[in-house]
Regions:
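Sequence context surrounding c-type heme c attachment/ligation sites in exported
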Residues: 6-111, 118
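Low-complexity, Lys/Gly-biased intrinsically disordered segments
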Residues: 1-10, 209
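Short amphipathic alpha-helical surface patches that mediate protein-protein
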Residues: 1-2, 82, 263
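General structural signal for alpha-helix termini and helix-helix connectors
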Residues: 3, 60-64, 147, 247
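Short, functional "switch" segments adjacent to catalytic/cofactor/reactive centers
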Residues: 11-12, 17-23, 88-265
Length: 265
């Protein structure tokens, strides 16, 4: 991520990575190899359309039919996103949970959250104590109602109280479940992480993730730049990609901005 001067700026940068998470990917896809390359494809397509004004995804299976983008260009760009983790495998073995990352807090924000957490814990303890008391009283009433020699008037009175306690317990169960689900916690947002071992991507022949071709070093679209970025081994290269996209010498980004401004003139 970009350098940041404040905790708030750091949090905003993390939230911004949610752009790569959003989309219509089938995260329950049974073929996980296909799921992975589909996610990479979607992230690349979003980036291409939003910032470069080009449908790069058309070159996934072959050289672009209209724009000057080769299949090699596609996989050079795709490599930047290969090292980005969007979904992950849970402890239950389900590889379909979207990444939710914790956001940093200022001291004031943390103090405010601590206050809310204490108030929530106190309320939850009170609700559970009320439920326990209601359960205990209902059990006592059930035992009394088992007596065969209870006067009719007394039985009616005890039955009414027992039924009221049963309703009360159901209500408290719902309140406790709701309170536990919406408990205050560390602020979170959908976002992405770099994988432990990022790297270049192999060409998938005709888009088939199980038919692999040669490895293509990460790089930019040759139509706009022939430069090869220097990427640290433990990083995905998204930082270098962002620098290239926003660079003064990138004619594609400039064209997109001009067209958007012209649209509003």
């Amino acid at each position: 991520l970009l350098p940041n001067k404040t905790v708030e700026e750091r949090a905003a940068n993390l939230v911004a990575t949610g752009f790569l998470v959003l989309g219509d990917i089938e995260i329950v896809e049974a073929d996980k190899a296909k799921l992975h390359v589909d996610i990479v494809d979607q992230q690349l397509q979003k980036t291409g359309k939003a910032f470069l004004g080009m449908s790069i995804g058309c070159a996934r299976c072959h050289d672009h039919k209209f724009d000057p983008i080769t299949q090699g260009d596609y996989y050079a760009m795709a490599g930047f996103f290969r090292g980005t983790s969007t979904v992950y495998k849970t402890k239950r073995g389900v590889w379909s949970d979207v990444n939710v990352i914790e956001l940093p807090e200022t001291e004031a924000q943390k103090a405010e959250r601590d206050k809310h957490e204490k108030a929530h814990a106190d309320r939850l303890a009170k609700l559970k104590a009320e439920r326990e008391a209601a359960r205990k009283r209902k059990a006592e009433l059930d035992d009394q109602l088992k007596k065969k020699d209870l006067p009719k008037e007394e039985r009616g009175k005890l039955t009414k109280e027992r039924d009221e306690k049963a309703v009360c317990i159901v209500k408290l169960d719902k309140e406790i479940t709701h309170a536990e689900f919406f408990a205050p916690s560390v602020p979170r947002a959908h976002g992405v992480r770099d994988v432990e071992k990022p790297g270049d991507m192999k060409i998938t022949i005709r888009g088939n993730p199980r038919a692999l071709g040669k490895v293509v070093p990460r790089g930019f679209l040759h139509v706009a730049s022939s430069a090869r970025p220097e990427i640290p081994q433990d990083q995905s290269g998204r930082h270098e990609l962002a620098d290239w996209v926003a660079g003064r010498d990138n004619p594609l980004t400039a064209r997109v901005i001009v067209n958007r401004v012209w649209h509003h003139v």
